[in-house]
């Protein structure tokens, strides 16, 4: 036996779940009921981590606002979830793809074919930090369900040395795996139904947290007005329909008027709203938005105060 091989049996994510001891004997309906029962732990874990998640949102928003980036880094399921969440930001918020990025051990090939052995190389995590030129303007969140992934620890150590803000997202309590980071998010959801299969509850709760961080950061930097995605990228028919409905709903105009307004404003919903509300020319509305760092509400308030 390799003397350097650590026993991870004490980790919450590696333990056997007493509720699923008869997993191989369950009917399909019983199996579904057990999944639903166990998934309730995800909601409770996220609620317990609310303050740390809120701090991560603030760090991410600050990074993007100052021209930096939000990075997720991980291996296996954890890394893939980071890539997935990052990939959804440009179509939803019309954000620059550089602003939110996922780094996966093994690169793009590992997104589709498992390369789990790569997670053991802490030096590869450090190399990734250098390759992406991560520095003081950036915020990097390391994701590892069991908390021990060397690739993630190597990346976070290198990121801290480079002056970046760092965060850690794990499904084990801090007394099982300690780490020095700026924000430490722990969402212990208990042992998995299939012991050690952290693509299950751990994967679910990880995606819940990432949803909150990326969406919260985009709200903070002005990508949302009310609960509408006013910076939506109008790149297909579904999104064009959504853009027209946003304009129709918020401005009480018909779809034909909404289409004309959108076309006159470079297919920018946010600019179209501001132009309609203020009566400015499209170029003037665009300039006012730029003056207020893209915050529609701030631009409307500033215009109203001058009248």
UniProtKB/Swiss-Prot annotation:
Assigned EC number: 4.2.1.126
Protein name: N-acetylmuramic acid 6-phosphate etherase
Pfam families, sorted: GKRP_SIS_N
SIS domain location: 60-223
Source taxon at top rank: Bacteria
Membership in a protein family: Belongs to the GCKR-like family. MurNAc-6-P etherase subfamily.
InterPro entries in the record: Etherase_MurQ, Glucokinase_regulatory_CS, MURQ/GCKR, SIS_dom, SIS_dom_sf
Self-association state and partner proteins as the record states: Homodimer.
Remarks, miscellaneous: A lyase-type mechanism (elimination/hydration) is suggested for the cleavage of the lactyl ether bond of MurNAc 6-phosphate, with the formation of an alpha,beta-unsaturated aldehyde intermediate with (E)-stereochemistry, followed by the syn addition of water to give product.
Recorded metabolic or biological pathway in which this protein acts: Amino-sugar metabolism; N-acetylmuramate degradation
Keywords: Carbohydrate metabolism, Lyase
Organism: Synechococcus elongatus (strain ATCC 33912 / PCC 7942 / FACHB-805) (Anacystis nidulans R2)
GO molecular function, one term: carbon-oxygen lyase activity
Active site (record annotation): 88 (proton donor), 119
Enzyme class: lyase
Alphabetical GO biological process terms: amino sugar catabolic process; N-acetylmuramic acid catabolic process; peptidoglycan turnover
Physiological role: Specifically catalyzes the cleavage of the D-lactyl ether substituent of MurNAc 6-phosphate, producing GlcNAc 6-phosphate and D-lactate.
Catalytic reactions of this protein: N-acetyl-D-muramate 6-phosphate + H2O = N-acetyl-D-glucosamine 6-phosphate + (R)-lactate
